[in-house]
Amino acid sequence: MSENHLLSSNSAPHSDVEDIKRKSDYLRGSLAETLEDRISGSIPEDDNRLMKFHGSYMQDDRDLRNERSKQKLEPAYQFMVRVRAAGGVVTPEQWLMMDDIAQQFANGTIRLTTRQSFQLHGVIKWNMKQVIQEVNEALLSTLAACGDVNRNVMCNPNPYESEVHQEVYEWAKKISNHLDPRTRAYHEIWLDEEKVVDSRDEVEQEPIYGPVYLPRKFKIGIAVPPANDVDVFSQDLGFIAIHEEGRLLGFNVAVGGGMGMTHGDPKTYPQVARVIGFVTPEQVLEVAEKTVMIQRDYGDRAVRKHARFKYTIDDRGIEWFIHELEQRLGWELEQVRPYHFEHNGDRYGWVKGSDDNWHFTLFIQNGRVKDEDNYLLKSGLREIAKVHTGDFRLTPNQNLLIGNVTSEKKPEIEQIIQAYGLTDGATYSALRRNSMACVSLPTCGLAMAEAERYLPTLLDEIELILDEAGLRDEEIVIRMTGCPNGCARPALAEISFIGKAVGKYNMYLGGGFSGNRLNKLYRENIGEAEILNELRPILNRYAKEREEGEHFGDFVIRAGYVKEVRSGLDFHE
C-alpha cells in the first residue's frame, strides 16, 4: 500500500467524511445500535454516511415537510434501498421477490435506475433489516450499491451477438465480484453473522480499498459496439468490447469520465472518458483493480466535490495516469483498436439473438414500475415473471428487457404483453423513447426542481412542436435531472435540463447522439414557457436545414447555437 494512501486516513488534509470512514471499523460504526432505536425514524449523520456503503440513503418525503413542521413532527423519514445486479440481469424468481418486497415494505413501486439497479423507495427504518435480508434471500445484494466504492458494474443488455454479450456479461460479473468490499460488517449488521475478532491487518481486511475506501464513488461500464447504451464515456472506467465474427478479442480502456458538477462552481464539470489502450479479456481484472487503487491513492480526500477520478486525471494529466497504471501492471497497454458507436438508446420491441432466443424491450417511462388506473405495468410484469423461463435485464436507459424467450414461449409472453397493453413505445415520439429523468422530488434530498414527475408533461408540449415540424419520428436524446449531480447523465444528451430552482432549469444543447460528446449551456434558469419558446425555432430550423443523417446535437453546433465541447475542461467556457 502506498505512502500516499496511508497518509490519506490520518495526517494528510481530509474531509470529515474521511474521519467517519476511518473510525467506522470497516463500515460498522454504530449502525447496529442505531437500527434498534425506535424513538426516531432517522439515523445520526455519521451512520447515514456509512449506510450508503450498505446500499441505502436516508430521505424524507419533501411534499410533507411543511405540513409535518406545522404539526411539530419530525420529517417523514424513509430510506431508499438500492439493489445491485451486475449488468442488470435477474431471474424471473428474483423479479417476483423484488415485486413482493416493494409491495410489502416500500411504496409499492420499483424504480429501475440508469445504472441497471433496482431502487425501492419509502422503506421505514424498522423494516430496513428485513428488507435487506429478503434481498439477500433473493441472491441479490445492496452492498456497495452506494458509497465511496465501485458501484454496480454496467453492461450492454440487448445483444446483437448473443455469444459475445454473454462473454462480456460474465466479465461484468467478475469485475463486480473482484471489487466488492471484503468487510464482514454488512453480514454482521444485516444478516446476523456472528462477529469475531479480526486479527488481520488492514491490507488483508480490505486489500483493494483499505480502511478509508475511495475518496468518492467509482463507476465502471462495459459497452458492446455499435451500442453505447451504457454511456461508456460517462464512466470512471469504461471497457469497450472489441469483437469480430462472434468472437470477443478484448477491450479498449477508457478512463476519467463523470457527470456531476456544482452550479456556480466552474472548477467542477462533467467530463468524457478518454480511450487510452487495448487489453485482452484476461487482463481486465488487473486493469480494473490497479485503476481503482490509483484513485484510492491519489484522489482528493480534502474536497469531496473535487474527489472524483476525472479530477485526479485532469489535475495530473492523462499521460501521468497511463505511466502510473503501466508501472503498477508491469506491462504496457496495446494500441487502441478501431470501434464505432451508432447510438446510446435501447432497441425496443422484439429482437432475435444469434442463438435464436428472443428479447423484448419494454419502454418504461423514467424507469418507474407501478400500476396506474389505465396501465397495469407492475401486474403485467408479475404475470410474465410467473411463466417466463429466461431472464429480465434492466437497461441503462431505465427500460426493461424480457430476455432469452424461446420460440416456444414467445406466444405466451406476447399474449400477456397484449392483455396488459404493455408498450414498446412504438406509438410514442422518438424523443420520448430517448428520454430519461432522475427520481428527484419528492424523495431526493439534493433535488432543486422536479424531474421524473415533470418530464412527461414537458414532453407532451415539446411533442406538439415536433408534430408541427414533422419530427415526431426523429431520434433525439433528451434528459432531465433535478440537480447537477448527473444521475440521468444529462451532460451527454442532445437536449438536457438540469434543475436550478423550483420550476427553473438550465438548458443545454449539443451532446453527441451516441454519447460521445458533452453538451453546452444554452440558456440559464428558465421555466416551461421559455423552454418551449427557445426550442420551437431551433426544432423548426433543424427540420428544414438539417443535412442527410445529421443528428440534432450535431446540427445545433453547426448552426451556431452552441460551441462544440471537446473536453469537460471547456464545458464552462
Curated annotation (Swiss-Prot):
The cofactors it requires, by name, are: siroheme; [4Fe-4S] cluster
Q: Where is the composition biased (Polar residues)?
A: 1-13
Q: Spell out the Pfam families in the cross-references.
A: NIR_SIR (PF01077), NIR_SIR_ferr (PF03460)
* One of the GO biological process terms: sulfate assimilation
Protein EC: 1.8.1.2
Q: Which family does it belong to?
A: Belongs to the nitrite and sulfite reductase 4Fe-4S domain family.
Q: Which PANTHER family match?
A: SULFITE REDUCTASE [NADPH] SUBUNIT BETA, SULFITE REDUCTASE [NADPH] SUBUNIT BETA-RELATED
> What name has this protein been given in UniProt?
Sulfite reductase [NADPH] hemoprotein beta-component
Q: Which source organism does the UniProt entry give?
A: Brevibacillus brevis (strain 47 / JCM 6285 / NBRC 100599)
